Amino acid sequence: MDRYDMEDVVVAPPAECSSPLKEWRLKRQAGTLDRSDIIEFLKRESPKYFDYQTSATVKDTNVITLKCMFKESLAKEEIIDVVVEFMLGDNPSSALEKLRLEGNTATVCGKVFKNGEPTYSCRECGVDPTCVLCVNCFKRSAHRFHKYKMSTSGGGGCCDCGDDEAWKKDQYCELHLANRKNPLESKILTDAVLERVEICFGAILAFCVSYLEIEPNASLQCLDGNVEGGQVDGAQYCTVLYNDESHTFDQVIQTLTKIAKCRAKDAMEIVAAIDREGRAVVKCDTFEECNKLKVSIENQMILPTSLVSTARNNQSLRTSVLHIGAVACQQFALQLLGWFQEFLVRHYLFRKTFSELVQRKQETFCIRHILEYDVKLWKTARTCWHRLLISGMLMEYDNKMILAQEFSRRYATIVEDFISDDHDHAFSIVSLSVQLFTVPSIAHHLIAHEGIFDKLLHTFYHVAIEKFIRNKTLHFSKNIASLTFFKRANYILYDLRYLLSLKPDVLSNDLRNGFLEGCRALMRVLNVMQGMESMTRQTGQHMDYEPEWECAFNLHIKLATTISQVIDWASGDVKLLRKLYKMTMRALVSNSFIVGGEKVMQPKKVADHVANCLVYDISVQPVSIHLPLSRFFAGIYLHLGAHDLTYDGLQTETEALSIKLTPREIIEPVLCTQAMIAQVGAGLWRRNGYTLLHQLYFYRNVRCRVEMLDRDIACLQIGASLMESNEFLIHVLNRFNTIPWLQENYWSLLSGNEMNDDIIREASIFDEFLELLIVIIGERWMPGVSMVTEEDRLRKEIIQLLCIKPYSHSELSRALPDGNSGNSDNVFEEVINTVAVFKKPVGADSKGVYELKEHLLKEFNMYFYHYTKEDKSKAEELQRERRKAKKQLVCCPPPMLPKLTPAFTPMANILQCPVFLNICSLIMERALNAYSRSFTESHLQKVLHLLGYAIQEELSEHYPFLSFYERSQEYGILEKLEELARCPRLEAHYDFVLWTIERFKQLQAKQAPSDGRAGPSCSQQGTGGKLSLSAEEQAREERENRARLAAERRAHIMAQMQKAQKSFISSNAEMFADTENETRKESASTGPMDWEDIPPEEEQGAVALESKVACLGPDRKFYHGTDDTFKCILCFENCAISRGGRQLVSSAFVQTSRVIFTTPNLRNSQSALHISCCGHVMHYSCWLEYFTNEEFKELRRPHRNRAALAQAANVEFQCPYCRTLSNAIIPVTETLPAFSAPPSPNESYLPLDSFVEIMSTLAIELGNVKDHELTTLPSVSNILRLSGVVGGLAQFERSVQLIKNPPRLHADYIEGIEFLKKALLNTMKIQQSHLKDHPAIESIEMVPILWDSCSYTLQALEIYLYAVEKPLKAELSMRHQSCARNLVRACSRSSALEWETDLPLLPPMRSQAEFSSRLLDTIFNQNDTSVLEWDCFRVLVPFQFGVLNLMVPEKGYKTIIPSGSMFDFYIMQTMFLAQLTKAVLCFDVEKEKAKRAEKAPNSELTQLDYIEQLPSRIRDNMIDFYRRYNIPARVLQKTKQKQLVEEESEENQGHGQTVVIPCESHHLALLLEYVQRQMSSFLRCSCLFYRFLTDVDFPDTFPTDQPDRFDLMCQYLGLDPMLGVYFDMETVYATMMHSFASHPHIDREVEQRCQPDARRSLQVEPCLRPLPRLKVLCDDFSDLINSVSDIFCPNNEREEMKTPTMCLICGLILCGQSYCCQPELGKVSVGACTHHAHACGAEVGIFLRIRDCQVVYLGRGKGCFVPPPYLDEYGETDMGLRRGNPLRLSQAAYRKIYLQWLGHGLHGEIARLNDNANVAAAAQWHHM
């Protein structure tokens, strides 16, 4: 247990002289028992169970380690159990069991959620999103089959199962449904028992209140020296440090280490305990010492860590000095409250008693007191009281109502306390509001009878905004948004949202009156918000500083939902609506922003119509984005029509109350805002800074637009419906200041001048005016404006969004405003399914998207008011492409409009009024005037859009008064359109003009029968003949003609170019002839070997010959060819690999790895080095210059946010070309066979047995020389002589391919290799230094480290290829191919070290000789590990590179470069035989039979025919070898032999029979199949290795889409695929296999297996290592999150893990929370995950943060978040569970993570994501 958590420690019980139980019973009988008796008992007993220990550290006696503990289990036995026994009688456990069987627990679950616990809400049945279920109830309820959401609790809430008001149906789970049937009475809880219960409950409550409230006066009480009998002088006091949310962990740790003299580790544990519990004891000593520490801590000056400091931030840490007795009583009180909460759940009568007690106002523990003193408590104490109230008061409705009433009455006080406090909202009593205000009946009761609506807003007004009101308007000061008090005050608005979340069906008079009282308070808030943060246009100079704007928008965002809810409530009740309308009008009249004060009017004339306009110049007078009062009026007005209320009817009532407001005054503030937005677009407000741009962005943003932009448009539509159309348009034109712009004579004066800025601005503003007019007329999908529903409005919004692009589900839901109802998700899904088709995701990286149904594309509106400019551009382009593809007119015509409601019908008149027609006519005239300077094409496009609306409105016949066609004739609209169609300058709008004319013709045809006068003149008829109803066909024909002419023009130009080209060739014939000859020569001879054409009849034979390509052995194919040419990625110079040229290198990345060791084996700490590279080539000198610069930049980089472990072993840099993470280089060299001359066909070589003898002799010779005497290598001629190879030096030299006078290694090459080796060594040092039992750094062998890295890298590549199902012949990526090729070549070249015979051995060569000596001794002389312990491929590589170059003849300058010589083949054969032997030894016939029966019971053995065809001699040898050496067979034989001996001894028979293990042909066939399977990985690795060593490509016979075949791989390696050959006793093969199989270690292993209890000493390396896998995850994410809901932190058994994190490599669950679990890694404290990653993944790990549904890649002090493998039904991730959709495991997404890990790409992915992330401060990943 953590010492600061007061955990249970069992000690002997204290001796008691008398029993308190007897005393209480006697007093009870006498009637003198009082609760004070029990309180005294609790007070007296609790200090006995508190203890502490102090100890000084060995290094520093001043550093004290303190350990405090409260023995909870003992306190329960000795105190709580005594009280329970008094209440329930002598056998309390029996009584409690009977109570449980009665089943009167509760019909409401009421489980209190802990932080991070999973919760479930039903989207179909939940009344609102706050209605949740716990795991147990959810699993037993019908909701698990519905559409549900899952999230994690912040702590403090409770389960709503059983609450009738929380669910529309299925209110009970199976468990709580049963409890409904149980009666509320109890036979066990008699009146006498309940009397005792009442006394005990009262005592418990009084004790807890008394002792948990002593904090403020704690130090003063201590001075009395009398607290619980303690003395001031004794060591009886504690200094207690409290939690606050203002100081950081690091600040508190620093204070503890500096002042309290704690160790850093102890300080971390204290801080973790303070964060968890809310306080911790930091010192136990005398009062004087404790007080001194308290004063020191309080006087400590802590600098603020953030730029914005809060008031609390500047205060000192909160401490107090308490008597130990007081601390003990407090600790026991916390335990008592926890027990009490659980006890109350046991029966209804317990809760009834509790409720009655806390309702007594004279008691110290009444509800009022508990609510008000919450702020004085620390975190744990608060949580205990909250849980007690939930369990005691929220289970029954009556109790809940009582608590809600008391909570409402004290609301203002507790909220003010919360605002001045610094604890999080979840730890405040205010957080109970969600439990109370979301119950509809309680919320409505509180509004009606407690005035809670008014009280909430009054409190908010008083605490949050009153102090910022100047001149009746809000003006927030700078940085107010970041002040804590304002953020905390906003929780009041959340409570208001809960309160109004469910609208009642019917409003009672009390509820209506209470609601109206709240609305008055709301009007007061909206009144001061009207015009807040107003701006005045800056002229002359830029603003000095950016004014505050965020706070106003935050206030709007928090209040917007409430405003929508209030309007929604009012919409359903005509009385409420009428009164609220009058209230709003009164507020508007009283507000003076823009329309207040003296109104100056001025007449304005347009098209012979005059209107009196309000004089207000927005260019010089204040304007504001914030007009909530005007917008609230618009929201209310839209609902009048539903109740047959009209503006005129209500106007009479308001005028009677002296409230008079004309429509033009209503719309004026909104018009000013729209005009200001237009001016901003024209660039007139650019000196007002970014503040204005930010505000305009949020004005249109989805979070704000419902109560901003949408309401503004509705307000203007109201104005358009109430005002005469011409007057309305003149008002709008006047406000945009564009009336002069419409005068023709005014613009004709300017037409001859050059364009200037003012004209451009005016044109831009008029453009904005036209767009606003389009929006006012067209955006009528609003209930109340048109005959549409909310679903229609949502449908329109979705259609317009999907016209931009296909959207994923989350993108679409984010692009739509939040609904107020709890089931808005269901509505959204119903609507989306009617308009779009869901395309499922393809692949791991894609999301599912919705695509708009084809027939709805015609509803696209280019000027949709929620489009940004970018959206508009994208949507228009997409629409044009679609129409072009369908061969329709390429334009974006306006959609059909819904019918207006009666109140808004006058708005349609705008489309036929003279001012409108005058504007349209004028724009078209200017469009036709080539010299007009006052026209832009955008004007024409918008006018055509408006005309389209007008035509379609008349065609719809919704409005009898609409006669657009007739009036348009007066202005010659059709004639102008036809002129536009003929105007070549306006070709871009040709199709739109044609569409408009076509619609006009439809209207004309409709009008013709009814009105003859409407027919056009003769000239018009003539034009109409040409432009008939088939205008679209004519347009298409014209487009095709234009396309044909363009194609002819292109063909003519191409013919001219070809003619010129032929002319040039003929004039330069000689030059082209030379080029052809060169090309012919190059193609004829590709190298030293000339390829001849193969006649058709010989082709078959050629293929057969080609199929036997081998890279090793006597039939080896010798490589001929040229190396590739490259381009240096730094200097871009073309370069080829040449011995005399500049050295080339490729950047590489070295990392420690355990990927292929993660399969279950005994070597848990085994790791290796892996090398990867991207393959891009550069000159060494270019790279060195680049690297030096990168190194310098790294040194200059600030290291503040990086821990010691973040410093990488090697300087990391990125490939200059592809930015791949690198920390080393690999030299690029030419092909290895190029160094050796091709052998002659008739040359002889030393045989395999001579090779074996030579190797054995070399091992002995090297072993005989002591290390310090090894100055020269043994003589080759001497070794040959001792091996019995007489006169074979020439053969030896041919067999090893000795190179005489080899080329010298380039100096840059040597430097490059040294750099690579240094990188490998550094990486290994860093990894091993962090291991607990790490070897000495000096013991790391430098020689084999490169070879071992090469073998591991190739093994990792082979496993990766196997995992992605790629055979060897399949095309390798450039990354893998270049890495393997360059690495193998580098190993081979560096192993051929140059040395002269007269020079002593250099240290590297000596180390190599020592290493080779041990290696050869192990392989050939059986002096170390056995073949069972070898990873044969990792032995093969160092054998290949480390041995042969030790045998260079003495005379001359010579070397051996491994490249596929005969000795290289023998090395391969040796290791092949070793692997074969191991496979035969490990074969278990019974297991193989069982596997075969399970997979394919009736399949035939493929090798059976081969076995039966073998000579009996070889078959007998195989049987003999199997019986003699196979380990399971030997164990079985010994076991049976032992049994036989025992049986014979019992029967007194002494025949001495020997048990013979059966081995038939089918056994041998099974064995060969097993061997082939077990050797597949070794052979694939070997093929890869020798492919790059010899540069002989895989033959075409290798499969490209099927698994690699054993026989083909053997042929490629020069081996005999017929395994029977190796069991011929007349060959050296059998001898070698017998040698491998007869190792003493193997005999010992057999003996140990015969004894089941014996400890195994042999670590068997499997022949075929199992494929590494990540942890298998649950298919359903809810199962995974539930599985960790009860896991406790390893450092604190009482505290559940806050952030359970699963290692996906091994499946271990770790605590991902900082500080509570901090082991040390290399003397640095790190997080549990970082520590685990070093052990489990060799410095890199993959972790799943379960409750956040996040995957973390964790590297060396760095990390990144990647998408988790859990996806919802729409193919999307949900990191943080924000959307809450049910998640299921996506195998494709998990496989992507798996392949990144298997392919060693985690470090690179971390670097890539961190480079791309825009993170200002680096996260401290090492603390994870």
Curated annotation (Swiss-Prot):
<feature type="zinc finger region" description="RING-type; atypical">
    <location>
        <begin position="1126"/>
        <end position="1220"/>
    </location>
</feature>
<keyword id="KW-0479">Metal-binding</keyword>
<dbReference type="InterPro" id="IPR036390">
    <property type="entry name" value="WH_DNA-bd_sf"/>
</dbReference>
<dbReference type="InterPro" id="IPR039164">
    <property type="entry name" value="UBR1-like"/>
</dbReference>
<keyword id="KW-0808">Transferase</keyword>
<keyword id="KW-0863">Zinc-finger</keyword>
<dbReference type="InterPro" id="IPR055194">
    <property type="entry name" value="UBR1-like_winged-helix"/>
</dbReference>
<comment type="pathway">
    <text>Protein modification; protein ubiquitination.</text>
</comment>
<dbReference type="Pfam" id="PF18995">
    <property type="entry name" value="PRT6_C"/>
</dbReference>
<feature type="zinc finger region" description="UBR-type">
    <location>
        <begin position="107"/>
        <end position="178"/>
    </location>
</feature>
<dbReference type="InterPro" id="IPR014719">
    <property type="entry name" value="Ribosomal_bL12_C/ClpS-like"/>
</dbReference>
<dbReference type="GO" id="GO:0000151">
    <property type="term" value="C:ubiquitin ligase complex"/>
</dbReference>
<feature type="region of interest" description="Disordered">
    <location>
        <begin position="1073"/>
        <end position="1093"/>
    </location>
</feature>
<keyword id="KW-0862">Zinc</keyword>
<dbReference type="GO" id="GO:0061630">
    <property type="term" value="F:ubiquitin protein ligase activity"/>
</dbReference>
<dbReference type="GO" id="GO:0004842">
    <property type="term" value="F:ubiquitin-protein transferase activity"/>
</dbReference>
<dbReference type="Pfam" id="PF22960">
    <property type="entry name" value="UBR1-like_wing"/>
</dbReference>
<dbReference type="InterPro" id="IPR003769">
    <property type="entry name" value="ClpS_core"/>
</dbReference>
<protein>
    <recommendedName>
        <fullName>E3 ubiquitin-protein ligase UBR1</fullName>
        <ecNumber>2.3.2.27</ecNumber>
    </recommendedName>
</protein>
<dbReference type="GO" id="GO:0016567">
    <property type="term" value="P:protein ubiquitination"/>
</dbReference>
<comment type="function">
    <text>E3 ubiquitin-protein ligase which is a component of the N-end rule pathway. Recognizes and binds to proteins bearing specific N-terminal residues that are destabilizing according to the N-end rule, leading to their ubiquitination and subsequent degradation.</text>
</comment>
<dbReference type="InterPro" id="IPR042065">
    <property type="entry name" value="E3_ELL-like"/>
</dbReference>
<dbReference type="InterPro" id="IPR003126">
    <property type="entry name" value="Znf_UBR"/>
</dbReference>
<dbReference type="GO" id="GO:0008270">
    <property type="term" value="F:zinc ion binding"/>
</dbReference>
<dbReference type="Pfam" id="PF02617">
    <property type="entry name" value="ClpS"/>
</dbReference>
<dbReference type="GO" id="GO:0071596">
    <property type="term" value="P:ubiquitin-dependent protein catabolic process via the N-end rule pathway"/>
</dbReference>
<dbReference type="GO" id="GO:0005737">
    <property type="term" value="C:cytoplasm"/>
</dbReference>
<feature type="region of interest" description="Disordered">
    <location>
        <begin position="1006"/>
        <end position="1043"/>
    </location>
</feature>
<comment type="similarity">
    <text>Belongs to the E3 ubiquitin-protein ligase UBR1-like family.</text>
</comment>
<keyword id="KW-0833">Ubl conjugation pathway</keyword>
<feature type="compositionally biased region" description="Basic and acidic residues">
    <location>
        <begin position="1033"/>
        <end position="1043"/>
    </location>
</feature>
<dbReference type="InterPro" id="IPR044046">
    <property type="entry name" value="E3_ligase_UBR-like_C"/>
</dbReference>
<dbReference type="Pfam" id="PF02207">
    <property type="entry name" value="zf-UBR"/>
</dbReference>
